[in-house]
Amino acid sequence: LLNKDVLSSTLASILALHKWGLGQHHIAKGLHFLELNFASATDNSQITPLGFDIVFPAMLDHAADLSLNLRLDPTTLNDLMNRRDLELQRCTENGSAETEVYMAYIGEGMGKLHDWESVMKYQRKNGSLFNSPSTTAAAFIALRNSDCLNYLYSALNKFGSAVPAVYPLDIYSQLCIVDNLERLGISRFFSTEIQSVLDETYRCWLQGDEEIFMDASTCGLAFRTLRMNGYNVTSDPITKILQECFSSSFRGNMTDINTTLEIYRASELILYPEERDLDQHNLRLKTFLEQELSSNGFIQSCQLGRNINAEVNQAIEYPFYAIMDRMAKRKNIENYNIDNTRILKTSYRSPNFGNKDFLSLSVEDFNRCQVIHREELRELERWVIENRLDELKFARSKAAYCYFSAAATIFSPELSDARMSWAKNALMTTMVDDLFDVTGSVEEMKNLIQLVELWDVDVSTECCSHKVQILFSALKRTICEVGDRAYQLQGRSIRSHIIVIWLDTLHSMMKEVEWTRDKFVPTMDEYVSNAYVSFALGPIVLPALYLVGPKLSEEMVNHSEYHNLFKLMSTCGRLMNDIRGYEREHDDGKLNAMSLYIMNNGGEITPEVAILEIKSWNDRQRRDLLSLVLEEKSVIPKACKDLFWHMCSVVHLFYNKDDGFWSQELIEVVNQVIHQPILLN
């Protein structure tokens, strides 16, 4: 599949040896190989390197000038030369800035047709043109530029008699290591090394290093990696690349699919209002990637062994904010290719692009964590029975789903207490929500609130029903158990805080019941200020913060940053829920953000328009949340802030399609994350 690449490299070597007057035996073998395999030069099933149809014929012309006796099939040769003429005509007629750059990049194929003085505007500080040894060598032959020569000497000093397709590639290759470690879920084992690479990359970013900013792939990867690790980087370079390289035909001549995918991922990371132009660019790139998927446009990358279709499909179907950590890691492991050969003018590869040891470690770690997670799920199922929750047939007692949301986000083996707190409280909120939303009487709702307020009560006499008795007893045991675990880590009692979290949730649920009963129509502000609490993420996330490691003082949990994180996360969940549940709640006579928005506009807008507006609102909330989570100088520890973002990802995944609790797709994901170990071919 790389025969065209091999033909090109072989002929280049023959020309060099002939010029130096060396290796006659090797020249003869090379010529024989070219003659035997020349048909591949026009074989459309072969992978075509960038500029091959111009560069390879130019080398054949040069071979003829040197009187090298090549006995080539005349039909194939004519076909090849016709392709060159058509490609040159296409580029000349196009006349775009992208095409001008492309023609400069493949300058070694243009020879004397080039205005080399104009091409030199692309020369970089290191003396190269496009960090390409071959283009730079062609420029030196034409102009005898000393900076070009110094660059070529530096490449030869580093690599000896053979140089790579791209040099230097240091920043990109190091970032590939970091990206691989993060995407495979094993970055926690290399935190010191990763920090060193990120600090050095940030230093280069601040200095405007050409190795970053003159290469779209490196710039996209550097921006995404630095921003997601809390470094203050502007999106301006990404916008510039999108305008210059993807403006007219989405993907220019200089950009391979790896670059397109990298820039697409970078364009998702919008944090600030002034970056909203990236939205349109991101949408255009998404459309392009979808078209390439449907037309099998990634066939070259797939032929190289890389499962690019799966990578692109994952990026499109699951935005970075709508996929749980463990779910993403498994997909990345399964799609990982240790070969990962790249194609520009020639093929090139690096162990930093695909590493067998990284893959082995990631599989071992994933499966080891799975064993722990399965045991914890069994423990949770025992806990359900011990607390008689299985007797409440009305409840969506989906222990596996509730545990899945914990294990898929807080996966490290040592964070078992945080996972169990998350899962148990998630199950309790599900059952309490059903009591308030579906099956409970007003008397039962008020009774449950009163029991939590009084706390020390005789459940045999104070509970108005069997199900309230079971719910309160299980809730009390859960709060006490989580409080005891947290006390060991925090060195102070936080039980009263967990009780307050639950009471806030119960009171907000009760207010919604009363609004529906009394047919009261709140303002949008009144609704949202209550609804983000009643969405009931507080009891799941907030107690778990005490169990992920860092000390959380009372001053921290009373700080505005803590409350902003909670409000933004919960508002995202509420808005996503209201979009998904609009028709059902409308039929039940219940108000939500969708129906209120339509009412506030005089009932003159359609639900489709309302959905767009609520989604836009949700986007702003999500971006504000991510900005807070990534903020380096903050009151709340990063490990705690991450939980707010993880839960935001959970709700975006669950409400992305149909009711997540009953989705067949989600059942399969639960099995992949918890039950099915990864088996490599």
UniProtKB/Swiss-Prot annotation:
Cofactor binding note of this UniProt entry: Binds 3 Mg(2+) ions per subunit.
Broad class of the protein's primary localization: plastid
Positions annotated to bind Mg(2+) 1: D433, D437
Subcellular location: Plastid, Chloroplast
Entry-linked Gene3D superfamilies: 1.50.10.160, Farnesyl Diphosphate Synthase, Terpene synthase, N-terminal domain
Reported function: May be involved in the biosynthesis of ent-kaurene diterpenoids natural products such as oridonin, miltiradiene, eriocalyxin B and nezukol, known to exhibit antitumor, anti-inflammatory and antibacterial activities.
Designated name of the protein: Terpene synthase 6, chloroplastic
Organism (species): Isodon rubescens
